[in-house]
């Protein structure tokens, strides 16, 4: 069992009290959080905190992910690294710098990503429409991945797969939800808003998982390392988005847990309301807790642990050359 | 595993246990704590309780290994135990 995340929606003050976390909300409520039983803290409201609170979080290795206006991801406060290994970072950068090695890792990541997209379509094929031809195309694209010789070529294959995948969304989703076209900054309609929000949550889950290893989150393999971005998190998130985000979008919409009332349209964009975000997060947390039997570990693991094992596998691959098992849906 | 801890100790000594329990568990009611802990956390907690113990103190720790064999109902102003949202 992994520890649970905690989300704070209230506005108020976060402080340290008697060796644990204390929240005083503006409504005058006081609550204590068990700092030793929290995996990661998500701040969604207006919250002030001081260095003593950060020091406590640091001591217990709890990362804080901060969301600003309308729950746009603003950044993370990450505890001091518990895992330090120059060796790992050197190997990671070497692998990145070696075209051959980088490409091989990139292949695994994109193959897994396409595989997971295909698994989603396969599930809904026959239920919500006929996607057999797209499933077949994705199967071909997955095989085409290992033939690519350059990273931009690889990204082109991935983009192609993703486009075909998103094209099926309109048939899977119950009316009035429509994707039409994947757009963000700002999301143009309800479905886009929902996908963007959940992708952000998957991304932060990957940031937390990578932080538990000595890997450098800024050096990714498929995404080009740049400034101010955790490109390795983006790589890992690509594998898990179909499993954790997209599948949840379909479920929330088709079971009518989310309706158009949970969104507000402002200026050019469309975003989730606070109540909507709460509903989505409750379900997201539930899916992180869901377990599946792991063939190599021979025990049940939660989806949250699955992200962790994926990252461990990558690290093992970088250090020892053991094959990297990017998570491909097997259940 | 799911854990419930209740204590009945002299008023002056409550803060000792409150402090060590709050770090790991949700403070549900005055002397009732609930949460999900790992086996290691439970052992550490029990050891810590034991080191603070005096003859006047009474503490009971309940543990449930199977989350499916565990249910709860709340009445009145109670907070939902195990909620991940504030």
Swiss-Prot record, chain A:
Required cofactor(s) = Mg(2+); Mn(2+)
Q: Give the source's domain of life in one word.
A: Archaea
Deletion consequences: Loss of the 8 Cas genes in this locus (cas1, cas2, cas3, cas4, cas5, cas6, cas7 and cas8b) leads to loss of CRISPR interference against plasmid targeted by this CRISPR locus, i.e. plasmid is not destroyed by CRISPR.
Q: Which UniProt keywords apply?
A: Antiviral defense, DNA-binding, Endonuclease, Hydrolase, Magnesium, Manganese, Metal-binding, Nuclease, Plasmid
According to its UniProt entry, the protein's GO biological process terms are: defense response to virus; maintenance of CRISPR repeat elements
Q: Which GO terms describe its molecular function?
A: DNA binding; DNA endonuclease activity; metal ion binding
First-level EC class: hydrolase
Binding of Mn(2+): at which residues? Answer: 158, 223, 238
EC no.?
3.1.-.-
Describe the protein's quaternary organization and the partners it interacts with.
Homodimer, forms a heterotetramer with a Cas2 homodimer.
What is the protein's known function? Answer: CRISPR (clustered regularly interspaced short palindromic repeat), is an adaptive immune system that provides protection against mobile genetic elements (viruses, transposable elements and conjugative plasmids). CRISPR clusters contain spacers, sequences complementary to antecedent mobile elements, and target invading nucleic acids. CRISPR clusters are transcribed and processed into CRISPR RNA (crRNA). Acts as a dsDNA endonuclease. Involved in the integration of spacer DNA into the CRISPR cassette. Plasmid targeted by CRISPR locus P1 transform wild-type cells very poorly.
**Miscellaneous field:** There are 3 CRISPR RNA loci in this organism and a single cas gene locus. A CRISPR-Cas type I-B system.
Q: Which family does it belong to?
A: Belongs to the CRISPR-associated endonuclease Cas1 family.
* Name the record gives this protein: CRISPR-associated endonuclease Cas1
The lineage, from the top, is: Archaea, Methanobacteriati, Methanobacteriota, Stenosarchaea group, Halobacteria
Q: Which gene encodes it?
A: cas1
UniProtKB/Swiss-Prot annotation, chain B:
Task: Output the Gene Ontology terms for molecular function.
Answer: metal ion binding; RNA endonuclease activity
Q: Which Gene3D superfamilies match?
A: 3.30.70.240
**InterPro entries annotated for this entry?**
CRISPR_associated_Cas2, Virulence_VapD/CRISPR_Cas2
Q: Which cofactor does it need?
A: Mg(2+)
What happens in the null mutant?
Answer: Loss of the 8 Cas genes in this locus (cas1, cas2, cas3, cas4, cas5, cas6, cas7 and cas8b) leads to loss of CRISPR interference against plasmid targeted by this CRISPR locus, i.e. plasmid is not destroyed by CRISPR.
Q: Does the keyword Oxidoreductase apply?
A: no
E.C. designation(s) = 3.1.-.-
The protein's matches in SUPFAM superfamilies, at most eight in alphabetical order, are given as: TTP0101/SSO1404-like (SSF143430)
- Where along this sequence does the record place binding of Mg(2+)? 8
Which keywords does this Swiss-Prot/TrEMBL entry list? Answer: Antiviral defense, Endonuclease, Hydrolase, Magnesium, Metal-binding, Nuclease, Plasmid
Q: Does the keyword Plastid apply?
A: no
The main enzyme category here is hydrolase
One of the GO BP terms on file: maintenance of CRISPR repeat elements
What remark does the entry add?
There are 3 CRISPR RNA loci in this organism and a single cas gene locus. A CRISPR-Cas type I-B system.
* Function per UniProt: CRISPR (clustered regularly interspaced short palindromic repeat), is an adaptive immune system that provides protection against mobile genetic elements (viruses, transposable elements and conjugative plasmids). CRISPR clusters contain sequences complementary to antecedent mobile elements and target invading nucleic acids. CRISPR clusters are transcribed and processed into CRISPR RNA (crRNA). Functions as a ssRNA-specific endoribonuclease. Involved in the integration of spacer DNA into the CRISPR cassette. Plasmid targeted by CRISPR locus P1 transform wild-type cells very poorly.
- Family note: Belongs to the CRISPR-associated endoribonuclease Cas2 protein family.
How it assembles, according to the record, is: Homodimer, forms a heterotetramer with a Cas1 homodimer.
Q: What name appears for this protein in its UniProt entry?
A: CRISPR-associated endoribonuclease Cas2
From the UniProt record, report the name of the gene that encodes this protein: cas2
